[in-house]
Amino acid sequence: MAQTLTSIEPLLPVLRQRPFGLLSDIDGTLAPIVPRPEDAAVPEETRALLRGLVEKGVRVALISGRSLEAARSIAGLPDVAYAAGHGLTLWIDGRTEVTPGLEGYAALVRRAERDLEPLVRNIPGVQLENKGPLLAVHYRRTAQPETAREAILADLQRSPVTERFWVQEGRFLIELRPPIGVDKGTAAIALVERLGLKGAVALGDDTTDIDMFSAIARRREHGLAAATIAVVSEEATPALLRAADYSLGDTDGVRWLLGEMLRALG
């Protein structure tokens, strides 16, 4: 179970590793959760701290379920690495790498959107987010979120397209993802290897970040100095806290941690 992080001290052995990297989710970790997903943004103070870490030589990589375009726009940080679409797309040193096997999934997502259009019309607040080969169905703004969730799952079960995807739930969203063995865990390990990291701190707030925490924990058994940190909200699941070494309270806690890291690095 995650211990509440109140000091930078437990992380110092990890921070002393070279190269050292910060692997972080974006929504709910760096950027506050907002009612409309398109309005999300990393606060400028947080961006400034991340830029400061990059200047200190920290290899920052952001791992998100968003599309690459959306992730880069929300973060506003051109000089860091990205793993978008839960790792389906990597962006490192200005080069984009797309996971093989995604052919046809964008068309399937459009079909799923069409199947869900009646639901969007009938339940105010349901919103579809087309991420290319992935589809997110948001229901945070609905009047009765649990009722909306059940209706979305029922519609997805009726849609013949759904069987071509993994269905995964997150914070007031349900997502369709290509079943090709890529997640935030595989993305984290790819980034550790590509960036040559000897030490890493991983941050996340949602169920999809459990894959990242688990992968980092396994890598630690093979010599990576690492710490995993759950960013806690009222929506955090017990499984997230069980998977992490430490916990912080919301995006303000993350901002505090980034400042402490910057000071510790001198």
List each model region and its residues:
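Conserved acidic, metal-coordinating active-site core of Asp-based
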Residues: D115, I123, E129-A215, L224
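Active-site phosphate-binding/coordination module
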Residues: A41-K131
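Structural recognition of alpha->loop->beta junctions
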Residues: G76-L90, R158-S159, L240-R255
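Anion (oxyanion) recognition and catalysis
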Residues: V54-E55, V161, H222, L241
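Mg2+-dependent phosphoryl-transfer enzymes with acidic/Ser/Thr/Gly-rich catalytic loops
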Residues: Q3-L5, Q17, P178, G185-G266
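Glycine-rich phosphate-binding "P-loop"
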Residues: A31-A40, R171-P179
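Non-catalytic pre-domain segments flanking phosphatase-related domains
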Residues: M1-I26, L30-V34, E38, E45, ...
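The start of beta-strands in P-loop NTPase/AAA+ ATPase cores
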Residues: F20-L22, V80, A200
